[in-house]
C-alpha cells in the first residue's frame, strides 16, 4: 500500500513508513527497503533502522516509485534463487547424482557464492569472470546461458519486468 493512500486513510499528519522485507529476514540475512513520509522524525527513523537492521540490511529510498523494482528484485528474488537451486539439482540427478548428492552440492555452492558476493569488493561480473577459464566447462555453460536470443539475460529481464509490472498493478488495489 502506497504511503499517500495510507495518508488518505489515517491522515497526512501521521508518521508513516513503507517497508518491503524479503524472506531471508527469517534467517537475519534479509534486506528491507524503507520509505518514510515527511512526518517521520529523526529519532523515529533511527529507532526503526535499529529494529530493521536486526533482520539484515536496509536500503532507504527517497522515491517510493522504486518499490515496484524493489519488489521484483528483492521481494521475489529468493524465489529466483530457489528455482535455480531446483533446476541445478534436477540436472545433477539427470547426470547421475542422487538427490542428496546433487542438492548438497547445489545448496553449498549457492551459499558459498552468496558469501563471496557479499564479502567481496568485486562486482558480480568480475567474480564470474574469475571462475571462467577460456574454453573450459564454465565457459561452455555460460555461452549457453548468456545467449542473447534465448538465454538468461533475456529471460531474467522479462521475468523481473513482469514482476515489477504486477507490483504496480497490485499497488493500485
Labelled PLM ranges:
Residues 20-25, 71-81:
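Glycine/serine-rich anion-binding loops at beta->alpha junctions
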Residues 5, 9-15, 31-69, 80-119, ...:
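Internal alpha-helical scaffold of NAD(P)-dependent oxidoreductase catalytic cores
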Residues 1-2:
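ADP-ribose/adenylate-binding Rossmann-like module
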Residues 26-35, 143:
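Acidic/polar active-site rim loop that often engages polyanionic ligands
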Residues 18-20, 35, 156:
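Short beta-strand segments
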Residues 107-173:
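NAD(P)-dependent Rossmann-like dehydrogenase/reductase catalytic/cofactor-binding core
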Residues 16-17, 66-72, 124-129:
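Short pre-catalytic strand/loop immediately N-terminal to key active-site residues, enriched for Gly-Thr
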Amino acid at each position: 500500500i502506497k504511503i499517500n493512500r495510507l495518508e488518505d486513510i489515517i491522515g497526512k499528519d501521521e508518521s508513516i513508513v513503507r517497508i518491503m522485507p524479503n524472506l531471508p529476514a527469517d534467517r537475519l540475512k534479509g534486506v528491507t527497503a524503507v520509505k518514510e513520509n515527511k512526518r517521520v522524525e529523526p529519532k523515529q527513523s533511527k529507532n526503526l533502522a535499529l529494529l530493521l537492521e536486526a533482520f539484515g540490511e536496509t536500503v532507504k529510498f527517497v522515491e517510493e516509485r522504486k518499490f515496484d523494482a524493489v519488489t521484483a528484485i528483492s521481494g521475489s528474488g529468493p524465489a529466483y534463487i530457489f528455482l535455480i537451486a531446483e533446476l541445478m539439482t534436477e540436472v545433477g540427478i539427470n547426470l547421475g547424482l542422487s538427490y542428496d548428492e546433487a542438492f548438497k552440492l547445489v545448496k553449498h555452492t549457492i551459499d558459498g557464492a552468496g558469501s563471496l558476493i557479499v564479502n567481496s569488493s568485486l562486482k558480480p561480473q568480475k567474480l564470474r569472470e574469475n571462475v571462467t577459464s577460456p574454453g573450459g566447462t564454465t565457459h561452455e555453460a555460460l555461452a549457453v546461458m548468456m545467449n542473447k536470443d534465448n538465454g538468461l539475460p533475456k529471460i531474467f529481464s522479462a521475468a523481473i519486468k513482469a514482476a515489477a509490472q504486477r507490483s504496480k498493478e497490485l499497488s493500485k488495489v
